[in-house]
């Protein structure tokens, strides 16, 4: 979505063409705004569906008659979509959200999530998010569930939301949780950027939307300012330490906040996220791997499974082994920490 509308750019475009087609999903937002500027849109929602997701074939089917003046003829389908390999959306290799949600799953917490990359934690094998309604609803949901259902209803409860979501609509429900004596734990995932929707700045990055240095709002000070007495920080890449801090905070009879640190978005180049990792990539020791698949539980895209009954060097049976793609691995060491058999080691050239 482009807003504010680039009116000069649109005007320059209209001067170069004879007809304009506006293709957008759902409501005719851009189309309406362009018409309000006084321009004529030949094809828009009068031909293109206003519901559902658009695809090249749907757009072509919708515009063939008004643009080309002939009926649309569907091409022969060579490959059916259901026959294509499935590739569900996933967190990036090395993403700090992955070990955090792995820790939450290990602790068996009921997690109220929010809107961001971390919403992918709802899917297996992580399956570590149980509710996600709308932006900013995580903290209110966790606090409200604790008040209405009680501690015996859902068990230990926590809310998880990203840094930009916290500034957008997370402060108010945190105030409510403190004011109304809630006891839920809020985890703020500070990855230094608005990651999912385009790498925009926010009040916690230290830069304006024009990339100018500005005041960086401190999460810890803000949480304490609204009355949260228990605020702690964790490095999510240190799985056991993170689990211990979360375990302590969810057992408090008061609202608490945990902030992740040293965990910038893996795509945020200015933060140099890869410099903290000791090795550029890791590999599986085929002699030690038992094929237990525990490491696959973090759902890292750099890891895959090689099927095939086999024996380890010391005679243990296994159904296969895990493989690590060195071109995708960034060396975050999360898999190293959870492997019981020390079968993951720094890669060599």
Describe the function of each predicted region.
Residues 268-269, 290-325, 334-349:
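Iron-sulfur cluster-binding cysteine motifs and their immediate structural context
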Residues 122-259, 267-271:
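Thiamine diphosphate
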Residues 248-304:
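Glycine/aspartate-rich loop-and-adjacent alpha/beta segment that forms the canonical ThDP
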Residues 75-139, 148-151:
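Active-site diphosphate/adenylate-binding microenvironment
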Residues 4, 28-30, 48-51, 118-120, ...:
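Short gly/pro/ser/thr-enriched loop/turn and capping motifs at secondary-structure boundaries
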Residues 22-24, 41-44, 71-74, 93, ...:
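General beta-strand structural signal in soluble alpha/beta enzymes
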Residues 1-74, 260, 345-349:
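Terminal amphipathic helices with adjacent charged low-complexity linkers/tails
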């Amino acid at each position: 979505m482009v807003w504010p509308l680039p009116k000069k750019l649109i005007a320059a475009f209209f001067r170069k063409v004879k007809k304009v087609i506006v293709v957008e999903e759902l409501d005719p937002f851009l189309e309406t705004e362009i018409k309000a500027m006084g321009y004529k849109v030949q094809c828009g929602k009068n031909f293109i569906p206003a519901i559902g997701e658009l695809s090249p074939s749907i757009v072509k089917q919708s515009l063939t008659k008004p643009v080309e003046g002939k009926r649309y003829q569907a091409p022969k389908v060579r490959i059916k979509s259901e026959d294509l390999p499935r590739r569900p959306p996933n967190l990036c290799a090395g993403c700090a959200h992955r070990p955090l949600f792995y820790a939450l799953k290990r602790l068996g917490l009921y997690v109220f999530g929010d809107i961001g990359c971390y919403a992918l934690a709802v899917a297996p094998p992580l399956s570590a998010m149980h509710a996600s309604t709308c932006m900013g609803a995580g903290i209110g949901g966790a606090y409200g569930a604790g008040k209405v259902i009680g501690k015996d209803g859902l068990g230990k409860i926590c809310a998880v939301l990203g840094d930009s979501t916290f500034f957008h609509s997370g402060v108010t429900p945190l105030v409510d949780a403190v004011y109304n004596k809630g006891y839920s734990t809020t985890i703020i995932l500070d990855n230094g950027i608005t990651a999912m929707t385009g790498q925009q700045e926010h009040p916690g990055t230290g830069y304006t939307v024009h990339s100018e240095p500005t005041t960086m709002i401190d999460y810890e000070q803000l949480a304490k300012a609204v009355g949260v007495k228990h605020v702690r920080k964790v490095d999510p890449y240190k799985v056991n330490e993170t689990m211990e801090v979360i375990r302590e905070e969810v057992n408090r009879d008061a609202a608490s906040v945990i902030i992740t640190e040293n965990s910038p978005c893996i795509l945020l180049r200015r933060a140099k996220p890869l410099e903290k990792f000791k090795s550029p990539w890791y590999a599986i020791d085929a002699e030690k791997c038992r094929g237990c698949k525990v490491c696959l539980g973090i759902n890292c895209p750099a890891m895959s499974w090689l099927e095939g009954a086999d024996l380890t060097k010391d005679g243990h049976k296994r159904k296969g082994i895990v493989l690590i793609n060195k071109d995708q691995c960034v060396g975050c060491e999360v898999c190293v920490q959870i492997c019981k058999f020390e079968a993951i080691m720094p890669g060599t050239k």
